[in-house]
Design a protein with these regions (language model features):
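GHKL/Histidine-kinase-like ATPase module
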Residues: 18, 26-27, 33, 37-166
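Outer-membrane beta-barrel proteins
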Residues: 12-14
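Single conserved hydrophobic/aromatic residue that forms the stacking wall/gate
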Residues: 1-6, 10
Length: 166
């Protein structure tokens, strides 16, 4: 049970529908095929008497998540670059798009929890992205033409990515 001291502190919990909806939408994207329903019994539709309700579902998971994040930007490539692999028994999923902007927008998750401060999975992703794109540029002799040293920051301009480790 709840002690009297706790009930004095936690008299009434107010839930913000927008915050809950945002998190449940995020979880649906992170778990393709999972259907999540949210019903707010505090808000009644005057026309039909129903409660405010929303269903979150994503067939394509991270691919759709990146498209959702990118919906207001101009894309360099319309296709989502998608990787799904397992390393040392740990599933990892990555979805990437590039836009015409200059900033990097990377969302990383471990076990469906947003790792806002990054982590080794994010650092590893950035290193691998830089190494892979730099090798491609060198192999295709693109760097000889520009005569400029390219850094990891250059490859991350306009990048939107979602990384999920489970």
């Amino acid at each position: 049970g709840v002690s009297s001291a706790a009930s004095d502190v936690y008299k009434r919990q107010v839930y913000d529908y927008k915050i809950l909806a945002s998190r449940l939408r995020e979880l649906a994207y992170l778990n393709a095929g999972l259907r999540i329903s949210l019903t707010d019994r505090r808000v009644v539709n005057e026309e039909d008497g129903s409660f405010k309700s929303e269903v979150f579902y994503s067939e394509e998971g991270l691919r759709e998540f990146v498209r959702f994040i990118e919906s207001s930007r101009e894309h360099l490539i319309n296709d989502v670059i998608y990787l799904n692999s397992e390393k040392q028994g740990i599933p990892i999923e990555i979805a990437i798009m590039y836009n015409t902007g200059f900033s990097e927008n990377v969302h990383s998750y471990v076990n469906n929890i947003n790792t806002i401060e990054g982590g080794t999975h994010l650092a590893g992703f950035r290193r691998a992205l830089t190494r892979t794109l730099k090798k491609y540029a060198e192999d295709s002799k693109m760097l000889e033409k520009v005569k400029v040293e390219i850094s990891g920051d250059d490859f991350r301009e306009g990048l939107t990515a979602v990384i999920s480790v489970k």
